[in-house]
């Protein structure tokens, strides 16, 4: 757990020079790590959580939680991200995958982003245009060596009480629709298109509650895979494979994992 950005860069530089594989995690959401021993370095960025507000802009380090950022912005009467409240992501992870909910995408608010490149031992700055945000996508996903360090967001002046009312509504909706009582990696698959919801496709295959080992399709929301106890990465992968095969056979739709799977 690096204590600051220079320490993170040093660790990444030395790992790259020694050809040691690295996995970087913020909050660990939407990630499936391999079973057994990982033969590399696992970096946790949660101590890199500084947030600064300047006018209508907020700058946050990669390990800051998305919820903390939203609340800090709310206290400064800055909105735009509040519908994302409750997503258990770090700021870096949200930027990497373009986290979204309720029609709002994180990337829309990103003004620019700093990322360390161990190949050149430099921190590069990428504009919103260069990040090429799309549905759950960013240019970062094609740049395997870049590590997000800090980013700046452009926000909208909004009264704090309005923001907090929206947050309360989002929290209520999540509690009603999502399996928050059980561990999960979040939404298992990307929505194939705007008109197709994954949970409906899975439900039509009769897979709600279907189980492989300790992993199961959530009874509450068929778009989630939950850990009912003792689930392994293999359980989750086998269940995802079964779901994909069933949906393809019934609907002719190929589901793409939203979970980032490390082999």
PLM regions and their residue ranges:
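Short, basic and Ser/Thr-rich N-terminal targeting/leader segments
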Residues: 18-20, 25-27, 109, 182-183, ...
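Phosphate/pyrophosphate- and phosphate-bearing ligand-binding catalytic cores of soluble enzymes
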Residues: 31, 116-246, 250-263
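Anion-binding (especially nucleotide phosphate/pyrophosphate-binding) glycine-rich loop
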Residues: 1-91
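Structural signature of FAD isoalloxazine-binding scaffolds in flavoprotein oxidoreductases
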Residues: 1-5, 32-50, 96-128, 143-150
């Amino acid at each position: 757990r690096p204590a600051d950005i220079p320490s993170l860069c040093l660790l990444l530089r030395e790992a790259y020079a020694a050809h040691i594989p690295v996995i970087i995690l913020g909050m660990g959401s939407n990630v499936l790590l391999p079973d057994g021993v990982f033969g590399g370095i696992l970096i946790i960025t949660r101590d890199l959580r500084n947030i600064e507000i300047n006018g209508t802009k907020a700058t946050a380090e990669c390990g800051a939680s998305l919820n903390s950022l939203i609340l800090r912005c709310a206290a400064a009467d800055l909105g735009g991200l509040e519908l994302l409240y409750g997503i258990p992501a770090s700021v870096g992870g949200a930027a990497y995958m373009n986290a979204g909910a309720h029609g709002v995408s994180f990337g829309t608010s990103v003004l620019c982003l700093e990322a360390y490149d161990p190949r050149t031992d430099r921190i590069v700055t990428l504009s919103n245009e260069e990040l090429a945000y799309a549905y759950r996508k960013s240019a970062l996903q094609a740049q395997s060596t870049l590590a997000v360090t800090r980013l700046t967001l452009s926000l909208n002046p909004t009264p704090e009480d309005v923001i907090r009312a929206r947050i309360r509504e989002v929290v209520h909706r999540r509690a009603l629709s999502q399996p928050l009582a059980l561990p999960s990696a979040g939404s298992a698959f990307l929505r194939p298109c705007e008109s197709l919801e994954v949970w409906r496709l899975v439900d039509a295959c009769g897979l709600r509650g279907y189980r492989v080992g300790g992993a199961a399709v959530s009874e509450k929301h068929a778009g989630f895979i939950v850990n009912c106890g003792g689930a392994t990465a293999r359980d989750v992968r086998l269940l995802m494979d079964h779901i994909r095969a069933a949906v393809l056979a019934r609907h002719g739709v190929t589901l793409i994992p939203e979970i980032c799977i490390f082999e």
